[in-house]
Regions:
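Bacterial Sec-dependent N-terminal signal peptides
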Residues: 1-26
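Ser/Thr/Asn(+Pro)-rich, low-complexity disordered segments
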Residues: 16, 24-275
């Protein structure tokens, strides 16, 4: 039996050993096409936030009309959450060479300066401001104060700025430190309203009357992640388990046809900073 096996193994090993180096395989045209498409999407996204930025604040406008026709005269209205996505797009733009590192830094410095001086409510920014003044533009009658969800989207961007520039030159390190300070000033614990849940809104005029306790599952998970990880205004695990997860009730939602699912929108917003 052994005499039969050994010759067979020799034949197998000889067949597996290439007599010469295999020819290099050409790059997949599909992969090349995908890469080009990916770059195009990145560039167009960056261009929206760069060219379409409100000029005073540097932030993303709530609506950008390329023809400069604004029937509602809202060309200066900027958005906190959307601008957080824009901040990350600018970092991508720097990496891709769409703008220089210095150009990107200076634009981000303008944004950070606006965030430092614009209306803020217990560390949280409103959904909208007037970019020219930094004054809040009410999202609705009683929504004229802090918006902790939109603030969290902005913080995602600022934390990316911190990580990107923290080991750079003196100007970059200063920008990273300012971004870090803004994140540490958000009073997540205060937005509990004394309960084991986080509230979406607070108004200086109407207090907690919006009464929107945020529970999962939706696009707001990042707010709880940031609240739990805040080194200055953190919350306990009970806030997550009782508030977001509803003591297990979160497992009962979003199961059409018995399959756990949800809208991509709910996933996309809170994972903007993962990459």
């Amino acid at each position: 039996m052994i005499k039969q096996v050994i010759p067979a193994l020799l034949v197998l090993l000889t067949a597996c050993h290439p007599g010469k180096r295999a020819a290099a395989q050409p790059a997949s045209p599909i992969a090349a096409s995908d890469t080009a498409l990916f770059r195009l999407v990145q560039q167009q996204t960056f261009q929206y936030f760069w060219d379409g930025a409100e000029p005073v604040s540097g932030l993303a406008r709530e609506r950008f009309h390329a023809d400069n026709d604004y029937p509602q005269n809202d060309q200066s209205v900027v958005t906190s959450g959307g601008a957080g996505f824009g901040v990350m797009a600018i970092l991508v733009g720097i990496e891709r060479g769409f703008v220089t590192r210095e150009e990107g830094r200076k634009h981000l410095e303008k944004i950070v300066h606006f965030l430092e001086t614009a209306d803020r409510f217990h560390g949280a920014w409103p959904h909208w401001w007037y970019g020219e003044t930094g004054k809040v533009k009410p999202f609705s009658k009683k929504d004229n104060g802090g918006d902790l969800v939109e603030t969290s989207f902005m913080i995602q961007g600022l934390l990316c700025v911190r990580q990107y520039f923290q080991n750079g030159n003196s100007e970059e390190k200063a920008l990273a430190a300012r971004a870090d300070k803004l994140w540490k000033e958000v009073e997540f614990d205060w937005y509990r309203n004394g309960k084991n849940v986080l509230y979406w809104h607070w108004s200086p005029s109407y207090g907690w009357e919006m009464n929107f306790a945020v529970r999962g599952y939706n696009e707001c998970l990042i707010m709880y992640v940031l609240a739990a990880s805040s080194p200055t205004h953190g919350v306990t695990a009970e806030v997550y388990h009782e508030g977001w997860a509803g003591n297990g009730k979160i497992n009962e939602v979003n199961k059409p046809d018995g399959i756990a699912a949800g809208f991509p929108y709910k996933l996309q917003l809170k994972h903007q900073g993962d990459a």
